[in-house]
Amino acid sequence: MGVLRLAVCISGVYAAFLLWAIAQERLSKPFPSVHPHPHQQPHSPSDPPPGDKFPSPLFLNFAQALASSLSALCYLSFKAWRDGWKGRGLGQLLGLKEVFGKSQTALNGDAKANKKESELNEKTKEVVEKAPKPPKKSLLALLVQVSVFQTIASPIGFLALRHISYPTMVLGKSCKLIPVLLLNVLLYRRKFSPHKYIVVALVTVGISMFMLFAETSKKKKGGSDSMWGLVLLLVNLLIDGLTNSTQDQIFSSYPSYTGQQMMFTMALTTQIILLPLLVLPLPTNPISLLAHLPPPFGSSVPTSTLSFSPPAALESISFLLSHPSALAPLFAYALLGGLGQLFIFETIQHFGSLTLVMVTVTRKLFTMLLSVVVFEHRLTKGQWLGVGVVFAGIGVEAGMKRKDVMKKAKKD
């Protein structure tokens, strides 16, 4: 059952986010307007048709968060209906009792939590030895912590991309397994079996080689990478590690709290954070706010006129009305993101963040291998070597799991 569930989760993540990436790329391109701009110059048939780009990334994030919360709610409702509801109210369905009150785990003491955690670890084989745990935070505090991490991670990633090349960003993201592993050990004092460190090292090196030796890297590299951009990339990786390790801590400390309940809470929190930013007028140049502060804060900033842009929600709705061709990719982007999140949180709950990150960082590799078979694309020798290193890491993991299963079978 565990192998089948993992296979379904991996297939769901790959399929949903492969199509999601296509929708995301389409949303980054211009859309033709049904109302042509005045004084617009005619274009030749060889030129791409003129258009406008989607005005607000915040609106896109809000749409995906809304779709994620609805997807989680539908999943939880269907699961409760299949189980006959059993007297479940909305609070129990969404896990609100665990979030805002004493959870059953807390009421029954640490003994029951430790027993459930050891059973979970026996299934995933990620944690093989219980370590002394730091004082348990409330579930609400941990969820707020994850929400803050998720909210600031994306803007920092976009800011880093302004100062480094895209291949450098992809290469850095391929090393995401390292901060997830280290922060689980350092922050929450988890102990992993020695082979886990070998697997993480092999997969990270293999994925890095696959990205580094790609032929497109040289073509796309273009500019140089600044030190500031590399610092932002490291901060982004650190935040990713904090997010995933804290999610592991939540499922370890609160076994009755499910992945889809966390997904709903995270998506709802994101909507609450983004809503004021969408409906309120924001300064067109936030740095200009410093000019209006009293000395010494505003003394070194040139005086500038403070202007505000229209609310992003109104701009986005107006854009969709005048550019109806953007509706389909926006709907696909939000829906596929919501469906993909279902598989992501299912993977975290049952197999841990290390397995999830291993799935996500190898997604591009397996997509490229599929393109080699289907479209006869070619890989460089360095990329094939990277593929071999990744499969060596996967082989080590599979071999150790088989060894554990055989040991358990002999005991029984």
From Swiss-Prot:
One GO cellular component, as annotated: endoplasmic reticulum membrane
Residue numbers spanned by region Disordered: 31-51
Keyword field: Endoplasmic reticulum, Glycoprotein, Membrane, Sugar transport, Transmembrane, Transmembrane helix, Transport
Record has DNA repair as a keyword: no
GO molecular function, one term: UDP-galactose transmembrane transporter activity
Transmembrane parts of this sequence: 3-23, 58-78, 139-159, 197-217, 222-242, 262-282, 325-345, 355-375, 379-399
Biological processes, Gene Ontology terms: UDP-galactose transmembrane transport
Topology relative to the membrane: Multi-pass membrane protein
Annotated glycan sites: 244
SUPFAM superfamilies given in the database record: Multidrug resistance efflux transporter EmrE
Compartments reported by the entry: Endoplasmic reticulum membrane
Principal subcellular localisation of the protein: endoplasmic reticulum
InterPro entries, sorted: SCL35B1-4/HUT1
Function of the molecule: May be involved in specific transport of UDP-Gal from the cytosol to the Golgi lumen. Involved in the maintenance of optimal conditions for the folding of secretory pathway proteins in the endoplasmic reticulum.
Record's miscellaneous remark: There are two genes coding for HUT1 in strain JEC21, due to a translocation and segmental duplication on chromosomes 8 and 12.
Stated family: Belongs to the nucleotide-sugar transporter family. SLC35B subfamily.
Name of the protein this chain belongs to: UDP-galactose transporter homolog 1
Annotated source species: Cryptococcus neoformans var. neoformans serotype D (strain JEC21 / ATCC MYA-565)
Gene behind this protein: HUT1-A
